[in-house]
């Protein structure tokens, strides 16, 4: 059971509780303005008009999407497109958000904006965020719980403090801590 539902028995309702952003796959239609993609997603998820407009206005403000809404996805920079992808994944107000490498390839300003937005989304809307990343700064900024996986094995399941307690030396970075864990497990 997830969120009180059996996923394979209540697939349609279950999917409405999930938002997904994959770095290499887009839910935005490449040659149409972002707003057109959003309106199609509104119809797919059967979002009531008032809720859609309210959510779109909120996301547009928080992610600074104003001038981007009338631009085709193919004309956006990577950072702009990622912000639009994140908004697309949240239009239907999911309870769970899967983010795969949400800051990969982004400049420093865009990374900070995306991280700040994810934190706010989690805090204000109680959205559960499942994040996969190789960016240790993402982990440090966003993670309450860390699962470290290597070659299909669970190496660590704990808090960020638990991860940091494995420091090979006092001033070790998260990259160095994880590299040491991988060495310890011969990964």
What are these regions (language model features)?
Residues 139-141:
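A short, surface-exposed alpha-helical micro-motif characterized by mixed small hydrophobic
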Residues 112-124:
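Helical segment within the ABC ATPase nucleotide-binding domain
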Residues 157-158:
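ABC ATPase "signature
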Residues 91-95:
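A short, proline-enriched helix->beta-strand linker immediately N-terminal to the Walker B motif
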Residues 72-76:
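Conserved ABC ATPase signature
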Residues 97-100:
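Catalytic Walker B motif of ABC-type/P-loop ATPase nucleotide-binding domains
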Residues 39, 43, 50-68:
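Conserved ABC ATPase "signature" region
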